[in-house]
């Protein structure tokens, strides 16, 4: 019997015998007929739970719709949309992480909102506005804690992943008490979060193994105005970009006693100074084997770096100023999108030959790319055309197109099992 029909049986148990005896025979027959109809029609909804999907979540994902404050839940196997969830606030610079069972997504909005959504029910579980202006977040190694980094008033707040109740508030102030914006928040091994203080020029690491007593380690004087950061896929290196000077600041999380080191001294040297909002995302770095591919600043180039010694080993000329440089799972290809006004184009680099092997134009304002877990397809958001497109990564053919309202970030549940994502 259909499970919803089984639930309907409980309706009979709740009707007292005295009620049946009080009914005339005809009325009693009509009432029993009505209950029988409820029993045999499984589609009748008696609870919100009855609307939820019964399926796995490993091939699900979300698409951020930045203009409407909504998110689409998508089926990446069928290449279709399952739900649209509304009421998520300002998603103009939104990002997301997933619970370790990949059922829930946590959406970090620009307005300070933290939203927990249910991917199987297509519903908003809870939303809290925890600050005035936030810029991303992370989920802990064991999936029990969600952290949010804030511009206003600064600092990091940490929440219980189940209830979204706050468990820690970590102010971001320097030694003189001046508040700082927080950027580059990531999860790290050892139940830690690592983040950067933009105004104070610090990297901080917080150990959350005992949520009641967070242990914060500070690394001062890393450089001027660190604007973004990343953690390498193995969880070892945390690297911050500097807006106020050239080069990068790197912390080896396996050997933190060595402190912060400077690498790639020429990184950041463009033909002209760029405003911080045009600086490339460091999360857009790609790792393919021991090679790291990263967007050059102010140049139409992708830099190639040997991660064994963090020395530059090559440059690849590309179509425009790179924004995201994304590695296909397996590392054979790197896909690149570009800043305005050349943001209608995507290029593909072969990581063996270090050559551009394909160039195409998905449409107006390509914002984000997300690969399927094994890399056979890539999803691309095209904001100004209001679509998400799906491409075969071998033949470079378009396989599907889904309508979306000003789509930006695309996030698949495979991220639930990867450090720093």
Which ranges hold each PLM region?
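Predominantly soluble domains enriched in secretory-pathway, periplasmic, or organellar proteins
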Residues: 46-421
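Bacterial N-terminal signal peptides
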Residues: 29-42
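Glycine-centered signal
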Residues: 9-10, 45-47
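N-terminal amphipathic/hydrophobic targeting modules at extreme N-termini
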Residues: 3-22
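Compositionally biased, intrinsically disordered/low-complexity regions enriched for serine, proline
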Residues: 13, 20-21, 39, 211, ...
